[in-house]
Design a protein with these regions (language model features):
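Secretory targeting and sorting signals
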Residues: 2-36
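Flexible, surface-exposed loop/gating regions in the mature catalytic domains
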Residues: 37-294
Length: 294
């Protein structure tokens, strides 16, 4: 072999050795976002959304003893959590898809008008399970706008906006599992217009939360499951400052964070807790919630 040939071969070998660490680094960067962020990997996450009350009206209030004395005291409190806008409906869309999808009011829209990415479609595409439990929904998959008899309003159920979220994943609340091990990877629970504190008192909503999800919350602590409780918006009196509390396995009891978070950050965190590597809408540039995990 000539001297020139040996030099060329040495250069190729050096290039390969140099490229290998870079390739390995690329594999690390592409690892699931939940691992990169140091988040836990729960089997299930349930999100409950209440209505139209500010952080100041809820946190520390004697009208919400369960939320404060059990969930907040035993979980993680986001002291600087904010909604995105007013009124209700665009906030739900922001929380579910990282974008209001052009909806800026509470008017009834054509069901499944959007094919944009969202939490439900991302979970399904990744082979994971998704579901919603909608109190007052007349029947599974119903796209009715309202039902006065059951105090139901579709404006609080954003999954109906998306053609890539099957209607049969929108369950009635009576279908909420009694065997919690069968829960979807991520699910939303939406109370009706009274129990979500929209038309009725904070105490009404707090009692509903305890009576309907208290047993699950207790179970979650020892079964790799997490409950998140948040609000769509405030009452327009406190700059959209809202209560957001996490509770269950992996959540440090009595923890809190003063970092500024909003619905996009909550969505990003839900995606990453589920081990997704995709992020819908503004969640792509949002931050994972930190400071409350064990």
């Amino acid at each position: 072999m000539s001297l020139l040939s040996r030099i060329k071969r040495s250069r190729r070998t050096l290039s390969l050795v140099t490229a290998l660490p870079a390739a390995l680094a690329g594999m690390w960067i592409a690892a699931p976002s939940a691992q990169a962020a140091g988040l836990p990997t729960p089997d299930h996450v349930i999100v409950v959304v209440f209505e139209n009350h500010s952080y100041e009206q809820v946190i520390g209030s004697t009208s919400a003893p369960y939320l404060n004395n059990t969930l907040k005291a035993g979980g993680g409190n986001l002291t600087n959590s904010f909604a995105i806008t007013h009124p209700s409906q665009p906030n739900y869309l922001d929380l579910f898809s990282g974008n209001n999808q052009g909806i800026t009011n509470d008017n009834c829209y054509t069901p499944q008008f959007s094919s944009a990415a969202n939490l439900g479609s991302e979970l399904i595409a990744a082979g994971k399970t998704w579901g919603s439990y909608n109190e007052g929904l007349p029947s599974e998959g119903s796209t009715v706008c309202t039902n006065s008899a059951t105090k139901y309003a579709r404006k609080h159920n954003p999954w109906f906006a998306f053609s890539n979220v099957p209607l049969n994943t929108a369950h009635t609340f009576t279908q909420f599992p009694t065997d919690y091990t069968t829960l979807p990877k991520v699910s939303f629970v939406v109370p009706n217009l009274c129990n979500d504190m929209h038309d009725c008192s904070i105490t009404t909503g707090d009692n509903w939360l305890k009576n309907n999800l208290g047993a699950y919350a207790t179970w979650a602590q020892t079964h790799n499951s997490i409950l998140a409780v948040t609000f769509d918006e405030d009452d327009s009196s406190h700059s959209n400052h809202i209560a957001t509390v996490f509770y269950g396995a992996h959540v440090a009891p009595g923890s809190s964070t003063s970092t500024h978070y909003n619905h996009y950050d909550v969505l990003r965190t839900l995606e990453d807790l589920a081990g997704l590597t995709t992020h819908a809408g503004a969640a792509a540039n949002a931050s994972d919630i930190a400071g409350i995990w064990n």
